[in-house]
Amino acid sequence: MCIRDSNSSAPDRTEFPAEENACTQVKYLIKNGSDFGFEVLNNGNPKQGIEHVVMVERSKVLPGMQIGAGDSHTAMYGALGAVAYGIGTSDIYHYLATSTLRYKKLKNMRVRVTGARGKTVTAKDIILFIVKKLGAGGCTGHCVEFCGPVISDLSVEERLTLCNMAVECAARSSIIASDQKVFDYLEGREFAPKGETWSKAVEFWKTLKSDEEALFDKEVEIDITGLEPSVTW
């Protein structure tokens, strides 16, 4: 799927941006996507939108998938149990040509979030607090698994926010084990499995979680009791 999002002219959203480089990029996106049989979502298409939102809402992201995309916040898909990470243009080219990428194995990090969540505390507040505790480089070289009672209580949309911003503490990727909330969110969506295939998929997805005795290279527990809404700039 090729989605035009960042290079969308405002306020009239004309077909091509006025800026030369942006215009060239959009034209190649449309041409290459069409030539190779991708669904191209250009301005004016009712399904066009911010790439990560479109992918999730249309269930192009499913538990157990491995996904690479040209944006660091691709890690957001970990909220649905996918292993996802941002990659550069050259890596996208290689990915499309070979379906593979050569990467150094990431270290594993578990962040367990506990405590009592205040009524006005959002997922954004929680991840900002985590970034504050771990530091801007606290997760460098790691894939982070979020878990704990606070995480389990989050809605799917809130988990998406959490995983989206894991890159702000330098996580290469982030993930939350899929549960019934995720299955309910995906069921019936456009590209989700249907019928008997759905039932089999859910049974498989339930196995995609860390074992109780799993070992991590780094483990952190963060208590959010007393956390209040915050702002960043």
For the regions a language model picked out, list residue spans one by one:
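Fe-S-dependent hydro-lyases/dehydratases of central metabolism
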Residues: 4-233
